[in-house]
Amino acid sequence: MTDSDVFKSRKNNNVYHVYDDRIVVHSSSVTKEIPLPVDPDRFMYYLSFDYMFYSGEKLFAVVHTMGLYDKRFEVDEETLELIGPPISTM
């Protein structure tokens, strides 16, 4: 395993380890990997995860792209999945 950035949840006891190609989530009951997203239309190429942050009560993961702007995905802290369409970061 390579070095990762560590991010702790505000809502529960989840700890997120951010790697280039995945986010590994550790909670009291489960360890789960969230893989780097893939665009089924191949319009956008996602290169790597960068960091995580809160905006209000929502948790986001930022992904580097080959486009002009990186994208952010909302993270569902209950299902431990990326949800919704990606949002451009400017």
Predicted features along the sequence, with ranges:
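Repeated scaffold domains used in trafficking and secretory/extracellular systems
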Residues: 1-13, 38-56, 85-90
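Surface-exposed loop/turn elements that mediate protein-protein interactions on large endomembrane-trafficking
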Residues: 1-2, 22-42, 70-88
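Short beta-strand elements that form the blades of beta-propeller/WD-repeat-like
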Residues: 5-19, 24, 55-67
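Assembly/interface hotspot detector across virion components, adhesins/toxins, and nucleic-acid enzymes
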Residues: 16-18, 52, 73-75
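Acidic, low-complexity, intrinsically disordered interaction modules
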Residues: 29, 34, 42-71
